[in-house]
C-alpha cells in the first residue's frame, strides 16, 4: 500500500474524504483536534498492542461505545485501552507521549459534563484495575486502585465496620478514580461533613500515587515545610513541579482566598486553595477535581469513618420548594447525616413515568419535601435526634407535615425516590427532551431559599417550568433543562441562559458546579466565577 493511502489525513484514495483505509479498516478523520492532529492511529495501535497485556481497541464499535459519557457530548476517541496492570498504564502513557497523543482516564462513564469523552486515547481503568490494595482498620484508611466501583469498595470496608462519606447517586457503578476526578460528593457527604473529614473527595483523601504525562511517578499529599525542603533538595522533575506550584500559590494566595467561595459545594475550578499554607500545601487534594487534565491516578488512600449502626429517616412536607429551602439551616443544627430536597414536579414526573408510584404514598402532605436522615450507634439514639428536631419544628407557627419512619425497608424505598431524580427528569412522555448543562449549581445553604426563588424566576424568563431537587443540606440544586441543542438558535439560547445563570449563582456567593464538575459544558463559564 502506498504512503499516500496510509497517511492519517483526508485523501482521494479512501472511501470518502473523511476516511483513511488501512489493513481492511476505515479510520474516520472527522474527529481531529489541535491536540490529536498528526497522531498516526495505525502505528499507535500497533505499538500499544505489542507493549501491554491489557486490551487495545481501535475498532469502530469500541470507539463509538467510548465516544460519550452521561452528558451531551459525542467525540470519537483515537482509540481505547483497557490496562490490566500499573506497568500497562506506564507503557500507555510513554507510548502516547512519543506519539504526542492525548490521554484521558475513564471510570464508569457516569460524568455529566463531557469529562470522559474526547479525541484522545481513552484509558478505561474500571475493568481490571479495580482492587482494594490495603485496609488499615486502626488508622481508618483504605488504599485502592482507581477503577474500583464505590459500592464494591464500601462492601469491603463495611465488613470491618467502616464506610466512606461521599456517595453519588450512581454509587453502584461510579468509580473512585472518577469521583476523584470530579471531586464528587453525594447524599451522605453531609455525614462526612458533620461527623468525618468534610463533604467532598478532596477532604476524604490522604495521599495519591500519580503518573504525569512525562512519565514521573510520585506519591503526593499534604506537604510540611520540612518535606517540601527535602523534595526540592532532591532535585529532578518532582522538585521542579513542587517549586512551580509553590511560586504559583505564593503569587496568587490573596486572590485565591478572596475569589474561591468558602461553601460546602464549591467544585468548579482547580482546587488551588488546597495549596495554601493554611491547608498544608496538599498536592493530592489540589489534584482532586482536575478531571484527568494533570495526572493519571495509580492508587489513592482514602479516609474512612465508622458505619452508623442505626438510622432514622424523617420526611418533612412543605407548601412549596422555597419554604423548604429557607428552613434548611434550622434542620442542620441537629446534625443529620442526610438532608435532601425534592419538589412536586419531580413527583409528577415519576408518576408519569411509572417510577416508584406505589411508594409515593409514603410522603407526607405538601408540594415539596425534605428527607432528613439521622445516624448513630443505636435506634434509640437516632430516634431521639429525629424527635428532638420534630419537636422544634412543631413549635413553629407554620410547622411542616412530618412522617417518621422506623422500618428500614420503607426508608430504602424513600431513598429510591430521591435517587431516581436524574432518571425522572429525562425523557418524560409528552415533554421536550431535557439536557444537562446547568444541573448542579450550589450556594451557601443559608441562601438556598432565596436562590431557589431567583432560579425559578430565571427559568420562567425562558419559558421553562422544570423539577428541582438536590442536596439541600449543602445548598446544591439539581435539574435538567429542555435546551435545544440541535439548532443555531437553540445553541444561542443555551449560551445566553448559562451565562445568565452563572452570573446569578455567583451573585449568591455560589459555585457554577456543586458536584458534577466543569467538564466541557461549564469550563468556559469559569471566568464569570473567578475573573479573567
What are these regions (language model features)?
Residues 521-532:
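Acidic/histidine-rich catalytic neighborhood
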Residues 57-66, 274-280, 284-496, 502-504, ...:
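C-terminal substrate-recognition/cap domain of FAD-linked oxidoreductases
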Residues 131-135, 141-328:
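FAD-binding subdomain of flavoenzyme oxidoreductases
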Amino acid at each position: 500500500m502506498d504512503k499516500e493511502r496510509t497517511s492519517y489525513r483526508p485523501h482521494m484514495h479512501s472511501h470518502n474524504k473523511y476516511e483513511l483505509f488501512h489493513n481492511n479498516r476505515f479510520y474516520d478523520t472527522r474527529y481531529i483536534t489541535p491536540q490529536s492532529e498528526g497522531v498516526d492511529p495505525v502505528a499507535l495501535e500497533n505499538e500499544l498492542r505489542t507493549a501491554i497485556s491489557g486490551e487495545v481497541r481501535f475498532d469502530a464499535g469500541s470507539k463509538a461505545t467510548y465516544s460519550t459519557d452521561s452528558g451531551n457530548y459525542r467525540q470519537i476517541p483515537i482509540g481505547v485501552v483497557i490496562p490490566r496492570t500499573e506497568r500497562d498504564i506506564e507503557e500507555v502513557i510513554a507510548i502516547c507521549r512519543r506519539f504526542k497523543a492525548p490521554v484521558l482516564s475513564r471510570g464508569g462513564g457516569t460524568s455529566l459534563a463531557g469529562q470522559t469523552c474526547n479525541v484522545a486515547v481513552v484509558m478505561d481503568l474500571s475493568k481490571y484495575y479495580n482492587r482494594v490494595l490495603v485496609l488499615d482498620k486502626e488508622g481508618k484508611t483504605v488504599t485502592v486502585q482507581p477503577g474500583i466501583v464505590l459500592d464494591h469498595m464500601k462492601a469491603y470496608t463495611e465488613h470491618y465496620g467502616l464506610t466512606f462519606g461521599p456517595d453519588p447517586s450512581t454509587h453502584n457503578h461510579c468509580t473512585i478514580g472518577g469521583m476523584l476526578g470530579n471531586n464528587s460528593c453525594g447524599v451522605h457527604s453531609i455525614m462526612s461533613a458533620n461527623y468525618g473529614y468534610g463533604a467532598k473527595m478532596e477532604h476524604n483523601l490522604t495521599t495519591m500515587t500519580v503518573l504525569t504525562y512525562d512519565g514521573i511517578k510520585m506519591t503526593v499529599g499534604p506537604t510540611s515545610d520540612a518535606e517540601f525542603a527535602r523534595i526540592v533538595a532532591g532535585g529532578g522533575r518532582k522538585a521542579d513541579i513542587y517549586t512551580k506550584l509553590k511560586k504559583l500559590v505564593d503569587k496568587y494566595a490573596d486572590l485565591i482566598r478572596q475569589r474561591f467561595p468558602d461553601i460546602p459545594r464549591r467544585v468548579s475550578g482547580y482546587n488551588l486553595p488546597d495549596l495554601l499554607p493554611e491547608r498544608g500545601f496538599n498536592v493530592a487534594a489540589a489534584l482532586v477535581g482536575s478531571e484527568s487534565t494533570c495526572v493519571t491516578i495509580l492508587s489513592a488512600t482514602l479516609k474512612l469513618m465508622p458505619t452508623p449502626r442505626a438510622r432514622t429517616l424523617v420526611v418533612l412536607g412543605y407548601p412549596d420548594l422555597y419554604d423548604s429551602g429557607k428552613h434548611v439551616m434550622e434542620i442542620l443544627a441537629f446534625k443529620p447525616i442526610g438532608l435532601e430536597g425534592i419538589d412536586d414536579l419531580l413527583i409528577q414526573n415519576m408518576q408519569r413515568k411509572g417510577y416508584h408510584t406505589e411508594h409515593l404514598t409514603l410522603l407526607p402532605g405538601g408540594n415539596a419535601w425534605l428527607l432528613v436522615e439521622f445516624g448513630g450507634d443505636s435506634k434509640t439514639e437516632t430516634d431521639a435526634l429525629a424527635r428532638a428536631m420534630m419537636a422544634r419544628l412543631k413549635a413553629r407557627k407554620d410547622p411542616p407535615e412530618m412522617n417518621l419512619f422506623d422500618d428500614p425497608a420503607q426508608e430504602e424505598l424513600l431513598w429510591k425516590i430521591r435517587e431516581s431524580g436524574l432518571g425522572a427528569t429525562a425523557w418524560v412522555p409528552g415533554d421536550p427532551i431535557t439536557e444537562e448543562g446547568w444541573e448542579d449549581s450550589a450556594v451557601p445553604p443559608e441562601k438556598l431559599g432565596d436562590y431557589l426563588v431567583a432560579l425559578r424566576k430565571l427559568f420562567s424568563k425562558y419559558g421553562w417550568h422544570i423539577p428541582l431537587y438536590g442536596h439541600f443540606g449543602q445548598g446544591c440544586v439539581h435539574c435538567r433543562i429542555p435546551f435545544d441543542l440541535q439548532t443555531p438558535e437553540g445553541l444561542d439560547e443555551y449560551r445566553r441562559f448559562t451565562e445568565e445563570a452563572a452570573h446569578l449563582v455567583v451573585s449568591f456567593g455560589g459555585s457554577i458546579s456543586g458536584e458534577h464538575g466543569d467538564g466541557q459544558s461549564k469550563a468556559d463559564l469559569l471566568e464569570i466565577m473567578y475573573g479573567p
